[in-house]
Regions:
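Non-catalytic structural scaffold of enzyme domains
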Residues: 1-166
Length: 166
């Protein structure tokens, strides 16, 4: 049996952001992510000051398939208004790429929105994975809700999700 490899979204987000040399970095993320300070501390170690905004309402809307409503746009406006002129906005939640086109309406044209998912794809592309592997989906939450949320937000049907305790 081969080794299990993991790609962490937080580490990927930090790597890609540092390479961009932001002069005014903002982070939007879920409540627990923002309050944990994980990004703030990591960027402080690299002498990058950040402004953080809790964007929790967006996750629930996206999970319910709402990616373009007036309610979603109003939440985006409220969340992004105080940080709209930052040079870079880091998406610190895997839900937010589903509404990237909406988010762009509420930041200045000079603001770069950072989606760390491409960094993860690039990292995994360098792994020498055997052919014929399988996908495994894990969730610490409700697996049925995750199935519905994946379909609603991204149009992806997940066959089996295993619940794990962390």
């Amino acid at each position: 049996r081969g080794e299990t490899k993991l790609a962490g979204v937080i580490e990927a987000a930090i790597r890609v952001t540092v390479r961009m040399h932001p002069n005014r970095l903002a982070i939007i993320g879920g409540r627990r992510t923002v309050l944990s300070g994980v990004y703030r501390r990591a960027f402080a170690e690299r002498s990058i000051a950040v402004r953080q905004r809790i964007a929790q309402p967006l996750s629930g809307l996206i999970e319910n398939g709402d990616t373009h409503s007036s309610r979603l746009r109003e939440e985006c406006r409220k969340i992004l208004l105080p940080i709209r002129t930052c040079s870079h906005v880091l998406l610190a939640c895997t839900h937010y790429p589903a509404i990237l086109s909406e988010l762009r309406h509420f930041v200045s044209t000079g603001t770069t929105i950072i989606d760390p998912s491409d960094e993860i794809v690039n990292q995994i592309a360098h792994w020498r994975l055997p052919a014929g592997g399988k996908q495994t989906f894990l969730s610490s939450g409700d697996t049925e809700k995750m199935k519905h949320a994946a379909f609603n937000a991204f149009g992806v049907r997940l066959a089996k999700i295993t619940r794990v305790d962390i």
